[in-house]
Amino acid sequence: MPTIEQLVRKGRQAKPKKSKTLALKGSPLRRGVCTRVYTTTPKKPNSALRKVARVRLSSGIEVTAYIPGEGHNLQEHSIVLVRGGRVKDLPGVRYHIVRGALDTQGVKDRKQGRSLYGAKKAK
């Protein structure tokens, strides 16, 4: 236990915060290529077929990324933009694919909350 005098001189060293999105290497977004597009089931108590993709990032790391929204046009070799953000009921999925960027189309017929889904304003 340090004395008050030692604390005045040295102070406490803050522990560095651990990143939850290591594969992005400090970037907000990373480009990648889909190596496999498939569906998977969430953990209990939820039930669905969640759309996910294995993506090889430009940083050289392969990650599993969630495809948000209803319907998508992704297939193997599609170029996608990946952001951080986990999916709580899918273990190991810590990244999201950005809709409306690169090869990923926005969600069709989306009227509300369009920004996250790359949907243009309906005229």
UniProtKB/Swiss-Prot annotation:
Keywords: Ribonucleoprotein, Ribosomal protein, RNA-binding, rRNA-binding, tRNA-binding. Residues 1-21 are annotated as: Disordered. InterPro entries: NA-bd_OB-fold, Ribosomal_uS12, Ribosomal_uS12_bac. The keyword Hydrolase does not apply. It comes from the Bacteria. GO terms for biological process: translation. One of its GO terms (cellular component) is small ribosomal subunit. Part of the 30S ribosomal subunit. Contacts proteins S8 and S17. May interact with IF1 in the 30S initiation complex. NCBIfam families: rpsL_bact. This is Small ribosomal subunit protein uS12. It comes from Bifidobacterium longum (strain NCC 2705).
